[in-house]
Structures are given as C-alpha cells and as structure tokens.
Amino acid sequence: SENQDTPEERAAFDFLYASTKATKAEPNVHLNFNHAMSRVNLKFVPGTDPEGNPVTLTDIECYLVGIKRNGTFDTETGVAAVTEDAAVSDLRQMLNADNDYTFTAYLLPQTIGAEGLQIEAAMTTADGRRI
C-alpha cells in the first residue's frame, strides 16, 4: 500500500473478493464481492483557529502515522493480512481543493494500538501562519 496519492493509484489497493461454485446442474453463478482492505477517509472542513478566527483551507500535508503497509492477499480465501513483523511507516497525502481536502487510503486490516490511529496534518494559512 505504498503510493496512494491519486484515485487511480488507490484503486490498485482496493482488493475485492468473491467466491462461489458452479455445477453442471447450476452453471450460472452469482458473485457477491466484498472488500478485503480497510478504507480510511478523512475530510477536512474550514473552522476556526484557537483564537476563534476563521480559517480558510489551503494545501494540507496529512499523514497517517505508524501504519504497517506490507502484507499478503490470499486469493483462495479472500483474506488480506498485514505481515505482523512488518516495519511501520507513515502514509502521506497532499490535500487541496482538487481532492476536496479529503484523505483516502486503503490499508491492510490491522490492529491499531490503544492510542488509536495517529493523524498528523499541517497547513499554512492564507496569512502565512503554520497550523
């Protein structure tokens, strides 16, 4: 789950899985697909700074911190699994008006620690402040 900057790149990580059996008596099959990956969506909306001043969104540098990004997908069972001893790394995306200030990523299902999912984001405001 390395490069997910664009919708086209993210589509490569959205694994779908379906399984069924055809028989001679029932040769037509219906496939019900399920997503094997976990999707994370973060949408940033304008608000106010700590002093109560309105903030207009500009380019936002956003990270999911400490994510395991290596694993396997079993095509027999449809199970996506993180490699438990995989190194952790950060997943970065630049958010702007073109992507509606929305971070979207497909991740291998994994257990996040008790502290929860850590998100870091920074933006330079129109008047030059870094928040």
Each predicted region: which residue ranges?
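Short, low-hydrophobicity acidic/polar segments
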Residues: 1-56, 87-127
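Short, ordered, surface-exposed loop/turn motifs in non-cytosolic proteins
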Residues: 50-86
